[in-house]
C-alpha cells in the first residue's frame, strides 16, 4: 500500500465513562512517545489535565492535523465527522460504544492496529454527506449536514404528517405517515435499517427514502441517485414539525417553509485497517450466519 503517512494526529471524542477517557490518555502518551505531533480536543485535555498538550477545537484539528482519531461510538464519530468533513483530513475511530459501524479499531488491540495505519497500511474511502435547507421564499435558509440520515418527524407528540415529495423538481409522491427517513449509504445500516430500508454498500452513489409508519400498504422505500435533489412541501402545518440530522441537530419547520435535501459538496475521508471488510463488519454487527464452507 502506497498511502501517505501522518505527522500530526488529532485526538477527538466526548468520553461518557472512565474507560473511554482512559483510552484517550493512553493514546496521547503512546503517540507522543513515538514522536508524533499531537493535538487534543480542548475538553479532553481539560478532563485529563494535559496542561502541556497542544489543544484546539474540532475545526482547529481539521485545519492542522493529518489524521483524527475519534474515540467513542458511532454517535461521537457522527458529531466529529460533520465538522471534519470540511477539511482535508483522514479520520479513523476507536470503538468505545455499542454497535460501531464507523469505529473500526478494537480498544483492546487499537495501538497495534493504529501502528500499522500510521505506517501507511490502511484502506481509504470517501463517504458523502447530505445537506439540508429549511427555507422560505426570499429568506435565508437554515442549513445543516448529516453523515447518516435526515429525518422528517413530529416535534413533540407523535402524529401523522401529510406532505409531498419532489425529486429533481418533479412530483414523486404524496404521503401520510409518521415521518420520512432520507439516508446515505453510510446511514442505511442505522435508523433507516430499523424502519425496513435496504442496506446500500458505501460505494453506491445513492440515497434511500424510507417512510415511517405510512398510512397505506403501498408505501415502500425508494432508492434514487445521490445527485438528485429532494424537496418536501407541506400544504399546511398544524403542529410542531422538525428535520433532524443524525439525531443530533434539529431544525424546526414553520408554516410556509419547505425542506430541500441534496448531496453535500463535503465528504468524509474515512480510513480502515488494512484487513477491513465491509461485509465482515455487516455479518459481525448484524449477527448474520457464517460461511458454510
From Swiss-Prot:
Domain of life assignment: Bacteria
Catalyzed reaction equations: NAD(+) + ATP = ADP + NADP(+) + H(+)
UniProt-annotated location(s): Cytoplasm
Cofactor dependence: a divalent metal cation
Positions that bind NAD(+): 74-75, 148-149, 159, 176, 178, 189-194, 248
GO molecular function: ATP binding; metal ion binding; NAD binding; NAD+ kinase activity
Keyword tags: ATP-binding, Cytoplasm, Kinase, NAD, NADP, Nucleotide-binding, Transferase
Coiled coil: none
GO CC terms, sorted: cytoplasm
Its EC number(s): 2.7.1.23
Keyword field contains Manganese: no
Active-site residues (renumbered): 74
GO BP field: NAD metabolic process; NADP biosynthetic process
SUPFAM superfamilies xref list: NAD kinase/diacylglycerol kinase-like
One Pfam family from the record: NAD_kinase
PANTHER family recorded: NAD KINASE (PTHR20275:SF0)
Function: Involved in the regulation of the intracellular balance of NAD and NADP, and is a key enzyme in the biosynthesis of NADP. Catalyzes specifically the phosphorylation on 2'-hydroxyl of the adenosine moiety of NAD to yield NADP.
Family: Belongs to the NAD kinase family.
Annotated protein name in UniProt: NAD kinase
